[in-house]
C-alpha cells in the first residue's frame, strides 16, 4: 500500500493507544503531535513496525484543522488515510476502501462502515459521513481545500462536508469495510482536556453559524447569561465537571468574540 499515506494528529496521547500505529505499518505514516517539544519522536519510531514514518510537532496546541492541513500538504502519495489513534482498523478494510476509490473517478473520499450492519449494496453515496477515518483522493481534496483553519477542533468536518456536497465530487460509505471507533480515547482524560474540548465545541459551533450565515446575536447573549449563572450554581452545589463545562462554554463564547474583533 505504498500509494497510501496515513496522517494522524496527536494531542496528549495515552500510552496504551500507541500500538494502534502499527495498523498502518504497510502505509507511509505522518504524525503531527501538538503541545510537545518533540521528545516522543524516538518512542513512536520504536513502536512503529513499518518502514516509513515522519514526525512533526508544535510546542503549542494549534488545533486539529491546522495540524491536519500541514500533514496533507506533505503527502506525496495519490491517496491519504486520515484517521485517529482511537480507531481500530485492519489491512483488509483499508484495501477495500482503496479498491472502491480507485475505480470511482468522482469519489473524493470514502469511509468504512462504523455500524457493522451488513447491507446488500457494496457502497452507498452519502451527504453525511463520519470523518474519524476516511480515505481521501489527495489531488481532488487539494482542489477544494481540506479543513478551514478558522475551526480549531470541532465542526471543521461538517463545514468540509457541506463544501464537498456543493462540489462535483461524492462521498461514499463502503458497507463491507468495518471499523471500530473508541470515541474520545485518542487523548488522555483530564479536567484540562475536557475543558479544551468543551470550549472548542461551542467556539466551532459559533464559527459554523457565522460562516453559514445562521449566527444570531440573541443566541450568543442567551447562551452567555444562562451559562454564567449555571457556572456559579454548579460550583455552589459541588458539581465540578458540570461547572467546568459551563465555564468552557463561556470561554468558547469569549474566544469567538475575540475572533470576530481580530477579523475586523
Where are these regions (language model features)?
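A short, conserved alpha-helix in the catalytic core of glycosyltransferases
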Residues: 134-136, 140, 144-145, 150-178
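Non-catalytic, C-terminal membrane-associated alpha-helical segments of glycosyltransferases
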Residues: 196-204, 213-264
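Short, well-formed alpha-helical segments that are part of the catalytic scaffolds
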Residues: 9-26
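Glycine-rich, basic loop-to-helix element that forms the pyrophosphate-binding segment
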Residues: 58-75
Amino acid at each position: 500500500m505504498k500509494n497510501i499515506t496515513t496522517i494522524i494528529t496527536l494531542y496528549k496521547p495515552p500510552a496504551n493507544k500507541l500500538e494502534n500505529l502499527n495498523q498502518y505499518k504497510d502505509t507511509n505514516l505522518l504524525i503531527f503531535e501538538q503541545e510537545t517539544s518533540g521528545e516522543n519522536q524516538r518512542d513512536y519510531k520504536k513502536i512503529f513496525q513499518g518502514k516509513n514514518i515522519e514526525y512533526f510537532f508544535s510546542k503549542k496546541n494549534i488545533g486539529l484543522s491546522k495540524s491536519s492541513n500541514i500533514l496533507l500538504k506533505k503527502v506525496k502519495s495519490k491517496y491519504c488515510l486520515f484517521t485517529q489513534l482511537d480507531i481500530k482498523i485492519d489491512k483488509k478494510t483499508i484495501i477495500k476502501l482503496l479498491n472502491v476509490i480507485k475505480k470511482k473517478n468522482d469519489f473524493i473520499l470514502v469511509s468504512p462502515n462504523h455500524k457493522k450492519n451488513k447491507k446488500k449494496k457494496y457502497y452507498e453515496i452519502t451527504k453525511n459521513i463520519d470523518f474519524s477515518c476516511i480515505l481521501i483522493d489527495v489531488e481532488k481534496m487539494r482542489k477544494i481545500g481540506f479543513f478551514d483553519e478558522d475551526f480549531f477542533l470541532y465542526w471543521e468536518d461538517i463545514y468540509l462536508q457541506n463544501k464537498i456536497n456543493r462540489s462535483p465530487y461524492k462521498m461514499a460509505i463502503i458497507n463491507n469495510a468495518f471499523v471500530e471507533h473508541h470515541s474520545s480515547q485518542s487523548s488522555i482524560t483530564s479536567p484540562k482536556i475536557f475543558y479544551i474540548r468543551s470550549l472548542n465545541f461551542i467556539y466551532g459551533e459559533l464559527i459554523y453559524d457565522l460562516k453559514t450565515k445562521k449566527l444570531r446575536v440573541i443566541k450568543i447573549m442567551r447562551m452567555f447569561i444562562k451559562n454564567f449563572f449555571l457556572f456559579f450554581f454548579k460550583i455552589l452545589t459541588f458539581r465540578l465537571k458540570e461547572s467546568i463545562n459551563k465555564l468552557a462554554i463561556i470561554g468558547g463564547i469569549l474566544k469567538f468574540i475575540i475572533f470576530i474583533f481580530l477579523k475586523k
